[in-house]
C-alpha cells in the first residue's frame, strides 16, 4: 500500500487593512497591550513587523578578520490578526472600515472613533 505524499498547505492571503506607518495595538500574545508603529507589512504571509514589539535576540558571527561577534536585538513579525489599529488621539483600539467617498475614492476609517486614516 503506497502512502500519499502531503504538500504543505498554503495559507490563504487575507486583505490587510494595515499599512506601513500605522499605529497598532497588540491584542493577543506575550506583548498584548503594547502599541507601536508598523515598520513593514508582509502581505503574502499575513504578517506585520511592529516597532518595539515581539523582540528577538540573534547572535551574529564575526564576518571579517579582527571583528568580534555580537548579539543583535530586533523585531520579529506578528500575525496580522493579532494587531488592531490604534487611535493615538482617543487612546483606543478599533476595527477599520472602508468608506467610499462621493468622488469614488476609498478611505479607511476607525469604527469606534470615526477617525479617517487616509
UniProtKB/Swiss-Prot annotation:
CDD domains for the chain: KOW_RPL26
Pfam families xref list: KOW, ribosomal_L24
A GO MF label: structural constituent of ribosome
A single cellular component GO annotation: ribonucleoprotein complex
Keywords: Ribonucleoprotein, Ribosomal protein, RNA-binding, rRNA-binding
GO terms under biological process: translation
Family stated for the protein in its record: Belongs to the universal ribosomal protein uL24 family.
Role according to the record: One of two assembly initiator proteins, it binds directly to the 5'-end of the 23S rRNA, where it nucleates assembly of the 50S subunit.
HAMAP family reported for this sequence: Ribosomal_uL24_B
Quaternary state and interactors: Part of the 50S ribosomal subunit.
Record-linked PANTHER family: MITOCHONDRIAL RIBOSOMAL PROTEIN L24
Protein name from the UniProt record: Large ribosomal subunit protein uL24
Record organism: Synechococcus sp. (strain CC9605)
